[in-house]
Each structure stands twice: as structure tokens, then as C-alpha cells.
Amino acid sequence: MAPKAEKKPAEKKPAAGEEKSAEKAPAGKKPKAEKRLPASKASSKEGGAGDKKGRKKAKKSVETYKIYIFKVLKQVHPDIGISSKAMSIMNSFINDIFEKLAQEAARLARYNKKPTITSREIQTSVRLVLPGELAKHAVSEGTKAVTKFTSN
């Protein structure tokens, strides 16, 4: 029974704490306002927490081609789906191809002693990296996309 008696005063203490917090609430508003001005460091820490949220957004902005792979899949085969593992493999494949094309375009620009990679370097790198018929189709689609982009 002694523990019950100890619990009752403990229960009374939070009630007293609630009364104190109720008493401090009006007075607490003024110190909070006062604290906000010098506590800009605290708000910057809160901004730091906002940065973490910003970091989460940055993680979301990681470049993936999953949406575009899915759109192309639905254009070609509307009734077929794709697993997440297969989507990840396709995304890695596209990243690898783009990296090879970029490296080859940079090499071509360096050979020609030009500081800028233009559509001509990209087109030549596509012809060098991709085989045969695939290169021809890629070049035609690329030129079509560039003309559409420049016309707008």
C-alpha cells in the first residue's frame, strides 16, 4: 500500500505541473517572443531540420528513367508490366549507355580541341558507341528531337 501512496503524490505533482504550465502559459508567450529574436540560432537549427527535409527532397530528385521506361513499355506493349528489379536493371542500362556516350563525346571534343560538346559530338558518339541499325535509328530520333526543341 505504500507504493500506492507514492503514486498518488506523483499524480498530484503533474497536476501541480499542469497548473504551473497553465500559469506559465500567458507569461510563457512573452519569453517565447523574446527567445525567438536571440534564438535565431535555434531557428537555424530548426532550419537545419528543414535542410534534412530538403535532403530528403534531394534524395527524391535522384535521376531515374523509370517513368520514361514505363511510358515506352506501355507504348510498345500496353498489356505487359515490369518488375521493380527489371526496372532497376533497365535504369542502370540507360545510365551506362548515357555515360558511354558522354565519355565518347568528351573525347571527341578533346580531339578537336573544342571546349563545348555540341549535338554533332553527341551524334558522332552515338554512331561510334551503338552498333549498326540501332545507331541509325538513334541518330534519326535524336535529330528529330533536336529540330523539335529548336523550333519551339
Curated annotation (Swiss-Prot):
GO MF: DNA binding; protein heterodimerization activity; structural constituent of chromatin
N6-acetyllysine modified-residue sites: 7, 35
According to its UniProt record, where is this protein mainly located? nucleus
Matches recorded under InterPro entries: Histone-fold, Histone_H2A/H2B/H3, Histone_H2B, HISTONE_H2B_site
The family database entries (SMART domains) matched by this protein are listed as: H2B (SM00427)
Q: Where is the composition biased (Basic and acidic residues)?
A: 1-23
| Keywords of the record | Acetylation, Chromosome, DNA-binding, Isopeptide bond, Nucleosome core, Nucleus, Ubl conjugation
Q: Which domain of life, per UniProt?
A: Eukaryota
List locations, semicolon-separated. Answer: Nucleus; Chromosome
Q: Does the keyword Lyase apply?
A: no
Renumbered to this chain, where is the cross-link Glycyl lysine isopeptide (Lys-Gly) (interchain with G-Cter in ubiquitin)? 148
Q: Where is this region: Disordered?
A: 1-60
Pfam families from the entry? Histone (PF00125)
UniProt PTM comment: Can be acetylated to form H2BK6ac and H2BK33ac.
- Mention any one GO cellular component term assigned to this protein in its UniProt record: nucleus
Subunit structure, interactors included: The nucleosome is a histone octamer containing two molecules each of H2A, H2B, H3 and H4 assembled in one H3-H4 heterotetramer and two H2A-H2B heterodimers. The octamer wraps approximately 147 bp of DNA.
Tell me its family: Belongs to the histone H2B family.
| Function comment | Core component of nucleosome. Nucleosomes wrap and compact DNA into chromatin, limiting DNA accessibility to the cellular machineries which require DNA as a template. Histones thereby play a central role in transcription regulation, DNA repair, DNA replication and chromosomal stability. DNA accessibility is regulated via a complex set of post-translational modifications of histones, also called histone code, and nucleosome remodeling.
Q: What is this protein called?
A: Histone H2B.1
